Amino acid sequence: MDNELFEKAPIPEAYFSLAMPVVLSMLVTLVYNMVDTYFIAHTGNTDMMAGVPLTAPVFTVMIALGDIFGLGGSSVISRLFGQHRFADGKRLSAFCFYAAIATGLLILVLGLAFRDPMLALLGATDDTWQYASDFYTLIIVGSPFIIVSMTPSNLLRTEGHAVQSMIGSVAGTAVNIVLNPLFIHGFGWGAAGSAGATVIANICTDAYFVWFTLRHSSNLSIDPRTVIDRARRRLAVTAREVGSILAIGIPSAITNLTQSVGIVMINLFLLPYGTDAVAAMGIALKVIMIAVLVFVGFAFGAQPLIGYNYGARNMPRLRGILRFSYLFLSLFALVMTVVLSLSDRLLMGFFIEDATIITLGAGMLRVQLLSLVCVAVVMVTTCTFQSAGKAVGAFVLSISRQGVMLAITLFVGSRLAGYQGVIAAQAIADLLTAIVAVILFVVMLPELRSRKAR
């Protein structure tokens, strides 16, 4: 473990060493998602194009479940490492790994048992049923591998292995990009081929993470004996430790889930204004998502650094890290706002050629960009609460931006300003959530000022 990086390296160096690999990994994954859609679209089969996206919420749930043990575990383990309790960190890392496997197996059993009701709930019709079913079935079969992949990718960063975490994620994405056209077009497996490529890619990612942990990790473990008290024949993990992991992991999972919920809510409120408005907002939100993913990468890439120094009670360094995080991401968001605003029509044109939708979407994009700085503030604050184990603050922010706050602003905005109110709802929700984040952070400040070194 690179204690020098966490304890003594200049803050910008430590910050970017941990965060940049996460940013790059997220951007590569974003590229894959676009490429995956491209390969499905080029089958020319509209029923397949409609059927496969119906299963997207299932994949989102799997990622969220993986985050419970990945982000929740990394928060607790980072703080333990800061206290130099390396044996406890190793024990909990093994618990998180096998808890993710158990969760994946549970999803596999339940997902197959309730396949038909789930497909109906997801909106599969007679035309799309077969394609949705093919994709859903293979994704469910691969759920243990998909869920598990999220755990070591986060835990490795607690030791400073951010680059190796990125390599595992990027390698899986590369395998997916290679296998997708081969399985879909070369072998003619269609939707099943796309799902199969995704599962195999996650298996490759898991294999790399297991190999790296066994060969190069000094304070993480996947040895089941690490987490079993053989003398008492029970798990060597306390209810309090599990509760600490879940207290941070569940809000992280909720954050992922509310992203999908938020998009659905916006679409429902836009439907009365026509499909062009829905399509335009969909593209505008894709552009915004690119910026948000970069923010997430920078903010949460630094999570092990924040957690380690909080656990070590190194308050001067922690305050310096937080100042740098807020300043850097806020300035970065400001630059992104200007650049994307000046390129609004060009960016819309990358996704569609319809002039009406480009005009609508460009206006929507400019409105959404007004709150990018607020999004940056929310991301850094959320990461701070998660890193410090502040479950209440993390939970409040996880349900706010694209959950409770968005629901309120959509409802009020649509009634007060109609179409324009719906368009501005997310930006206003971002502003309100940022205000809540600042208030919660101010409440936390006395502890940051008074917390003494051990």
Residue ranges and their predicted role:
Residues 1-19, 77-144, 186-249, 306-371, ...:
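Short alpha-helical transmembrane segments in multi-pass integral membrane proteins
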Residues 7-38, 42-43, 57-72, 76, ...:
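N-terminal transmembrane alpha-helices
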Residues 17-36, 138, 172, 201-205, ...:
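Transmembrane helical elements of multi-pass membrane transporters/channels
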Residues 20, 36, 73-74, 114-115, ...:
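Hydrophobic/aromatic residues in alpha-helical transmembrane segments
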Residues 27, 31-50, 119-126, 182-189, ...:
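Helix-terminus/linker motif at the lipid-water interface of multi-pass membrane proteins
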Residues 49-109, 146-165, 280-338, 342-344, ...:
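Small-residue-rich hydrophobic transmembrane alpha-helices
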Residues 61-64, 176-180, 206-210, 290-293, ...:
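Hydrophobic transmembrane alpha-helices of multi-pass small-molecule transporters
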Residues 139-157, 165-176, 194-209, 296-299, ...:
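Short runs within selected transmembrane alpha-helices of multi-pass transporters and secretion channels
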